[in-house]
Amino acid sequence: MLGRCFPPNTKEKQQLRMIKLCDPAESELSPFLITLTLAVLLAEYLTGIIANGFITAIHAAECVQNKSVSTSGRILVFLSVSRIALQSLMMLEITISSTSLSFYSEDTVYYAFKISFIFLNFCSLWFAAWLSFFYFVKIANFSYPLFLKLRWRISGLIPWLLWLSVFISFSHSMFCINICTGYCDNSFPIHSSNSTEKTYFSEISVVSLAFFFNLGIVIPLIMFILAAILLILSLKRHTLYMXSNATGSKDPSMEAHIGAIKATSYFLILYIFNAVALFIYLSNMFDINSLWNTLCQIIMAAYPASHSILLIKDNPGLRRAWKQLQHRLHLYPKEWTL
């Protein structure tokens, strides 16, 4: 997100200024790279919207048909809806900031985009963490009394935890307005027009940044990592046990366990990359036009799409529904020719 021009904060002793000396010749991307980046981002946004729209539609149809939705389906609906909104917002923001910078720079418009961006990102992080936690509780094989009690109550707790995550994300996004203020540092001409573009930086207090990082990103990140690692260890232990008792032929159950280990590992890697990219991007460590900042945007756009595709691929119900959809789409051209 672009920064805004505000008067420098007078309480300089209480502020940590993330100053990045901006040389336009060094930080501004070439027109070719800008076009390529926009094309990649657009492809990622559309892929993510389609994949998450499919997940939402399947579970909505399940809810209408069965008058209820499973706990995992409820989490997936929350996650998919937040990602559809997030990627639609990011696509709209790029369009407006590229075509009407003066309109985008208005206080109301800019803050609306910033609050929505932070809120939807944090919702997505929390929902994905709860999905990982739910799979861990339901699949992992531990015999501790507290764990067994949690497994028995998890389905009733999840709806409350999801709405609590929405409240935390919204409260935190509103709090971020006060710490993510920027001040105007430099300006340079835009070669394609007679106007000038300003370079902005953020002033974020150390305490606020720590709170911002820990509450918004680190807590769901730690929860996701712990749940994923414990699930992988449990599946690995059970896989080794089945392999020691195998008769020599391929065991479908063991192959399913191996597939679950791989899928969880992929989810973990994607989640970590996205969380790190989000923190770097929101912290304004690099200039808005730098290659590193662009890379963070690409990673943040790729995560919802790739994670949703893996969810469809590894979920039997979603995978079956996707194959049926492909089959129907394949038959439509034949029906039109008849």
Curated annotation (Swiss-Prot):
Signal peptide: none annotated. Its main location: membrane. The keyword Transmembrane helix applies. It is found in: Membrane. Keywords: G-protein coupled receptor, Glycoprotein, Membrane, Receptor, Sensory transduction, Taste, Transducer, Transmembrane, Transmembrane helix. It comes from the Eukaryota. Glycans are attached at residue 194. One of its GO terms (cellular component) is plasma membrane. InterPro entries: TAS2R (IPR007960). It is a multi-pass membrane protein. The keyword Glycoprotein applies. Residues 52-74, 138-156, 227-262, 313-338 are cytoplasmic. Belongs to the G-protein coupled receptor T2R family. Receptor that may play a role in the perception of bitterness and is gustducin-linked. May play a role in sensing the chemical composition of the gastrointestinal content. The activity of this receptor may stimulate alpha gustducin, mediate PLC-beta-2 activation and lead to the gating of TRPM5. This is Taste receptor type 2 member 39. It comes from Papio hamadryas (Hamadryas baboon). The lineage of its organism: Eukaryota, Metazoa, Chordata, Craniata, Vertebrata. The gene is TAS2R39.
